Amino acid sequence: ASDVYKRQLLCCFENNILIEIPFFAELNFLKQALFELQKQSYSPVLAHPERYVSLSGETEIKDLKLRGAKLQLNALSLIGYYGKDVKKKANEWLKKGFYDFIGTDAHNEYHLSELQKLRLGKKELKEWMNIKISQQRLIGL
């Protein structure tokens, strides 16, 4: 195993660990990373999967979910901040209930101001609220 997997990592709430991979990484790289982290009793949460090139369809997402991966939606993806294709994937995957967490990925005030453009349909809003409730339970709110 790589030295990265041997180091102690900072986790919160049920050994969840947020991971990010290069946007053009091969799917096998991601699967191996998930496997190595799970061997160490971590519960990987993949940040903004809608932005990864190798995760282009539902088949890949369903496979990752079956492998125990959790997914974190980047809220900026829903407004088209990263392009139309990413927005389309994010909205479809939100409607289908693939996400376990929602994050802003806001690194500055501009990102936060962009989030004010967010508008959700009924189905997306329902899934958003389900995720929010699950997150609150997880952290004890």
Language-model region placement:
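Short, small-residue-biased leader/transition segments that mark boundaries at the very start
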Residues: 1-5
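Short secondary-structure boundary/capping segments
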Residues: 8-10
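Domain-core and long-helix interface of multi-subunit machines
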Residues: 12, 16-96
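Short amphipathic alpha-helical segments
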Residues: 58-59, 114-116
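Mid-to-C-terminal alpha-helical segments outside catalytic/metal-binding sites
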Residues: 116-141
